[in-house]
């Protein structure tokens, strides 16, 4: 945790699922599941600027709600820390102590990707007294998100995932400072989205190119990060695990991440220390819905014409379940909270 965030409380404070598929599988990935994830060619190189030529991704950025432009609030613009802990944290204080809650209230976490995993991560962080949250997702709610994303309901289709989750956080944790931003994470937005530098990042991005860039950036900047891999095509939450990226089993996406990070000069030593949430359950092949069998696949997502993940671009769409994505999210959030509490764990 940075000294600035320890001193200043931001008092207003799917994941890569197997269902997110694309038409352009990675040349080095032979798994059907991994080929279904959104890969873009990622150029070799050891420094982030060298990635520029290989990231011709469409970027959609909307202004931060609190400031009306792409300018982040400074420490002196944030409300002062509370003098007393609110009784809404009574049961949590009894678990982690006054000092633990105060530390979490002074913490800043950025969540990238607000789908089936990221939405549950966000709510759990809010209910764990994290004082400042930056919520990043370029997408709007689709009707097909309802089965697994907290902010997705029939009445919210077409609305910003980030803005909807921010409303939910404020209802739970009124003193939290929440930055909802609708943007696609890539080389052109990386510096902005990580400024000011958060105390911790949770990666629930559903695009491999962006995912690799985020992990590389966090490693190089020394930002603690936990990454979530494939939460789709599974039914057994008891198979969810946390391990170092170098030690995962079964998961094909983790293999791709290891290889791409190594191409950037982040080899075994660099990858060690990147915890990932993954499943050891074998992938389930997707069933064919009756409506697909009758009339072929038809995308019903809003604003799909300018989406980097329009369904028409996907080779295969895997199934998802909320009890799996939520299990991934709880594992990631638990790790994050424990990491934020480490300096006070012995007290």
Regions found by a protein language model. Give the residues of each.
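Conserved N-terminal Rossmann-fold NAD(P)-binding element of oxidoreductases
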Residues: 112-113, 136
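Hydrophobic/small residue at the entry helix of a nucleotide-binding pocket
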Residues: 117
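Internal hydrophobic alpha-helix adjacent to the cofactor/substrate pocket in enzyme cavities
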Residues: 263, 329-342
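N-terminal charged helix/coil linker that caps or initiates catalytic domains
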Residues: 2-14, 20-110
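Conserved S-adenosyl-L-methionine
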Residues: 127-132
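Glycine-rich phosphate-binding loop and adjoining beta1-alpha1-beta2 segment
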Residues: 137-173
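Short amphipathic alpha-helix with an adjacent loop that forms part of the alpha/beta core around
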Residues: 188-196
């Amino acid at each position: 945790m940075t000294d600035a965030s320890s001193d200043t409380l931001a008092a207003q404070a799917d994941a890569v699922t197997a269902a997110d598929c694309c038409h352009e599988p990675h040349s080095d990935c032979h798994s059907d599941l991994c080929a279904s994830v959104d890969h873009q060619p990622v150029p070799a190189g050891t420094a982030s600027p060298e990635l520029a030529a290989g990231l011709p991704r469409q970027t959609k950025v909307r202004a931060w709600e609190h400031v009306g432009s792409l300018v982040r609030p400074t420490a002196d613009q944030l409300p002062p820390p509370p003098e007393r802990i609110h009784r809404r944290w009574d049961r949590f204080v009894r678990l982690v102590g006054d000092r633990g809650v105060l530390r979490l209230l002074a913490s800043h976490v950025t969540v990238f990707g607000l789908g089936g995993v990221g939405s549950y991560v966000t709510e759990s962080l809010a209910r764990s007294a994290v004082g400042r949250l930056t919520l990043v997702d370029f997408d709007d709610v689709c009707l097909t998100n309802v089965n697994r994303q907290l902010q997705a309901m029939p009445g919210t289709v077409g609305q910003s995932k980030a803005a909807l989750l921010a409303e939910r956080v404020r209802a739970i944790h009124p003193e939290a400072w929440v930055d909802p931003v609708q943007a696609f994470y890539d080389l052109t937005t990386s510096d902005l989205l990580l400024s000011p530098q958060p105390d911790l990042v949770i990666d629930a991005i559903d695009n491999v190119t962006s995912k690799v860039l985020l992990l590389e950036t966090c490693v190089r900047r020394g930002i603690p990060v936990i990454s979530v891999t494939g939460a789709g095509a599974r039914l057994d939450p008891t198979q969810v695990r946390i391990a170092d990226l170098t030690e995962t089993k079964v998961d094909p996406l983790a293999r791709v991440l290891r290889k791409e990070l190594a191409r950037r000069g982040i080899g075994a030593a660099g990858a060690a220390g990147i915890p990932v949430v993954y499943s050891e359950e074998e992938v389930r092949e997707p069933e064919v819905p009756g409506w697909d069998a009758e009339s072929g696949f038809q995308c019903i997502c809003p604003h799909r014409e300018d989406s980097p993940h329009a369904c028409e671009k996907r080779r295969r769409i895997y199934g998802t379940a909320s009890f799996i994505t939520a299990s991934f999210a709880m594992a990631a959030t638990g790790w994050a909270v424990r990491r934020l509490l480490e300096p006070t764990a012995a007290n």
